[in-house]
Amino acid sequence: MCRKFLGIFCSVAVLFCFSPSTSLAELVIVSTDQGWEFSTDGMVNLFAVTSSGDERPDNVNNGITLGDGNDSFRLRSGFLPGVLAFNVKAPTTNGLDMGARIGFYPNPQNANTKNSFSAQIDLREIYFTVDGTFGQFLLGKTLSLFQGQNTLTGMTLMGTGVSAISGGGTTLGNIGYGYIYPQFNAQIRYTTPTRYGCKLAVGIYDPSVIASTGIEAGVTKAPRFESEASYTGDFNGLSVKTWISGLYQTAEFEESGDEVEANGVAGGLALG
């Protein structure tokens, strides 16, 4: 548990702050008369972080945050790594808009070792979309629905949040302090059109083993299911966003064949 975490450089050095996922402008490199578009977006960030930690409470398994007496200074990425992404949009055909995105997410630091080659480059996004009056179908890898909005609306998204001493990856933000990490996973997702500020998204996902300390149900015979219902509106200049998401999956123990299930429900409210 971190007692304090301070980003000395609280500003983010942005080379390209053009992300379609945040409805900002893109840098369009190629646009043809036939309607094809190629664009790129990205971001670079680096924080100076000094941290100290308190003693971990009892019964904490696999704790990776700072412990008692752990003081640290790092030059590192924050909760978000860097971003370099490429987008392709096809011309509208029979009312359908099709596109694809591939996103690389590198971190600037090594794992607290000068001559290490451990800086991570995450291939977090690679997906294809089809949009129409029916809504959107997405196939590929991107952020999961369950607790995804909890991550995207977190106050540490563009900052640092909870960190550990070493490591070549990002900080934890607020992960473990009210929500778990949704992760970027392979999926087939359908999202309805927005009606009166409301929309629903449902998806089938590449399943995961269901495990705890010393035990694992590793036989996955069915996909994982995730969903999210959300509402966005404006009341006298006050923007309101609320959501609820869910997850369900089963797995079996290899030797006994016994089945276990994992399920969860999460929600949130954001005012701006």
Regions found by a protein language model. Name each.
Residues 64-71, 169-174, 251-254:
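Extracytoplasmic loops and strand-loop junctions of Gram-negative outer membrane beta-barrel proteins
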Residues 19-25:
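Sec/Tat signal peptide C-region and signal peptidase I cleavage site
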Residues 52-65, 110-123, 152-155, 207-222, ...:
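Outer-membrane beta-barrel translocator domains and adjoining extracellular loop/strand segments
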Residues 70-73, 215-216:
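Second-shell loop/turn segments in exported
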Residues 9-18:
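Bacterial N-terminal signal peptides
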Residues 27-50, 72-209, 221-223, 230-233:
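Outer membrane beta-barrel
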Residues 1-9:
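Bacterial N-terminal signal peptides that target proteins for export
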Residues 222, 227-272:
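Detector for outer-membrane/organellar transmembrane beta-barrel domains
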